[in-house]
Amino acid sequence: MAITSTAQSPPVLDTNGQPLRRGVEYYISPAITDVGGNLTLKSRSNAPCPLFVGQEPVTSTNIGLPVTFRPTEAGKDIIDEGTSLNIVFEALSTCATSTQWRVDATESDTGRRFVGIGDEDGPAGIFGISRDNGAYNIVWCPAMMGRPRCGRAGILVENGVRLVALDGDAFPFEFIKA
């Protein structure tokens, strides 16, 4: 009889040292505090609807929007590094039916993929969290896709607006319980 063992990934910790939990609200904040604020919804090109994940300016008095993490594995309550999960802003939007994060198509002018919001039950809405050099990165690399072109979330400044996008330098984040 074969015995298999699977190593348990360490839990992702919030700024209080507690494991992230399914359904609990958190702010996603930069681990480098002098470059920008918490994550929120932003619009591109002065569009009337904020349909993209972005970052508050460092000088803003807005605290951003809280998110919840929803592991794709039924019954999983603790968020471990590498857990496949959905990320959802806990805010109402009159512009979108869902505030769940998803990866958009590659932009031809930047070669980057922006993170937007909207209905997404497929792989475009599945993220994970990894730890690198003591900070956390938000990653997109759904296992069900046979390892597509994976990416780490970073910040791309477009017309003065800080937007979350893949395919550039990773941006370190931390999680603050709301």
Model-based region annotation:
Residues 46-98:
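Structured domain cores in non-transmembrane regions
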Residues 2-47, 82-89, 93-178:
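Extracellular glycan/ECM-engagement signal in secreted proteins
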